Amino acid sequence: MDHTFWLTPGHASEPDSWYAGTSPQGLFRSEDGGITWAPLPAVNDDPQFREWMGSVQDGTPDGPKLHSIIVDPRDPSHLIFAMSGGGVHESRDVGRSWRTLIEGLEVVEGFDAATVSCHDPHCVRLCPSNPDRLYQQNHCGIYRLDRPGDTWQRIGRKMPKRVGDIGFPMVVHPRDADIAWVFPMDGTTVWPRTSPEGRPAAYVTRNAGRTWQRLDQGLPEGQAWWTVKRQAMTADAQPSPALYLGTTSGELWIGRDEGARWSNVARHLPEIYAVEVAEIA
């Protein structure tokens, strides 16, 4: 293991439990508030582990990693996680066994979609208001999965063609499962990991991906050659949620009224990898 990449608290009924995703890919569980950790061997000892890791040039810290660990709020035994270089997986027995959730997902042209290691989910989110719905920002588009189905639908094809549906973060509304936000990056063959045309914007869907609206009021109108990483965008739980994002150029932005109005609140920070928001009583 090179480093811990993702931390997720366990189910509300298990207040001392935590899950950790690592780079290279590994999944660990703590039952004492993080004092001690135990690997989940069904993941860490999987014979495909070396394939998930990729080659030397795909190494840490920006290469393979296990992320997007989700605990079903209705069932502490039901877990979902994703791997960059290993697809999306689901367990219904606290990680003792797993099944893949890659049906319907596309891969880079020339690769085999039936090969799990060819899949590169960037961020997966479960809707708090409807835990049977998942959204995913993938290396190859934006997707939605509605249970009990097992097939992802690519909902990013309705994004503007000049922008595309490639990016890293995925944010869902705390109370409306039809509302979700993404932050696209330049997904051309160059893959510069910057905003398309240097004009950053969030996009929102209010109908589960049938249409998308650009949200850029207050954001730079040009020459903003940055993007947002998978953990660096989130929303609060206010009646009209605000969005919060950190950029690869070290800026922190708030998008009030569900992202309708953006303002900068900090500059000249290091590259921002994660943003969280908490209400202080």
How would you name each of these model-derived features?
Residues 1-281:
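Extracellular glycan-interacting surfaces
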